[in-house]
């Protein structure tokens, strides 16, 4: 029996001691009724070794729990980040839809109120306005130190032509562009 078993089976040990004492002391006329085993006190070196073993086991268990807790934190952090990105994407999609709806409404209102203007002319005007807004935003950003932007009288027209050419190329390629266009 090892020391751990001795501590666990203290009652069994007391019973064995009682039986042995009854045998030995019975020869002298003594009758043992009960034996009280108060505590088992091992040698100091044995106690220190047992304490070190217990401490090492607790440290190992604590490390395991700490690792599991860190794993759970990382998973929750990743889930929160994924949810934030998803919600950010939903917000951007709604913002773009609102911009598209507003542009469509502005084009229709402007072309109905100002006679002789076509939807293309209104789109060109809106593109110029957005182009200047973009330049202003780039200039106001504190993160930008130098920005090279081709700027000239025909630059906005060139951008408009590039967009129209892209739409025509996609139409020739058979790509459905209706989902990208502003519908009245």
Swiss-Prot record:
InterPro entries in alphabetical order: Band7/mec-2_domain (IPR050710), Band_7 (IPR001107), Band_7/SPFH_dom_sf (IPR036013)
Membrane-spanning intervals of the chain: none
Domain of life of the native organism: Eukaryota
Gene3D superfamilies: Band 7 domain
SUPFAM superfamilies in the record: Band 7/SPFH domain
Matching PANTHER family: HYPERSENSITIVE-INDUCED RESPONSE PROTEIN 4, STOMATIN-LIKE PROTEIN 2, MITOCHONDRIAL
Protein name: Protein PPLZ12
């Amino acid at each position: 029996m090892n020391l751990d078993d001795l501590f666990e089976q203290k009652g069994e040990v007391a019973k064995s001691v009682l039986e042995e004492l009854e045998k030995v002391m019975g020869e002298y006329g003594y009758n043992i009724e009960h034996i009280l085993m108060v505590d088992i006190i091992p040698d100091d070196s044995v106690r220190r070794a047992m304490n070190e073993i217990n401490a090492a086991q607790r440290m190992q268990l604590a490390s395991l729990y700490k690792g599991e807790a860190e794993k759970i934190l990382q998973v929750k952090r990743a889930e929160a980040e994924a949810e934030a990105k998803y919600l950010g994407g939903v917000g951007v999609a709604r913002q773009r839809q609102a911009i598209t709806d507003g542009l469509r409404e502005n084009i229709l209102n402007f072309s109905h109120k100002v006679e002789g203007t076509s939807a293309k002319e209104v789109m060109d005007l809106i593109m110029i306005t957005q182009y200047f807004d973009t330049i202003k935003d780039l200039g106001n950003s504190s993160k930008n130190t130098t920005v090279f932007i081709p700027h000239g009288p025909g630059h906005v027209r060139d951008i408009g032509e590039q967009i129209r050419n892209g739409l025509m190329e996609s139409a020739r390629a058979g790509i459905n562009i209706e989902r990208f266009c502003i519908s009245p």
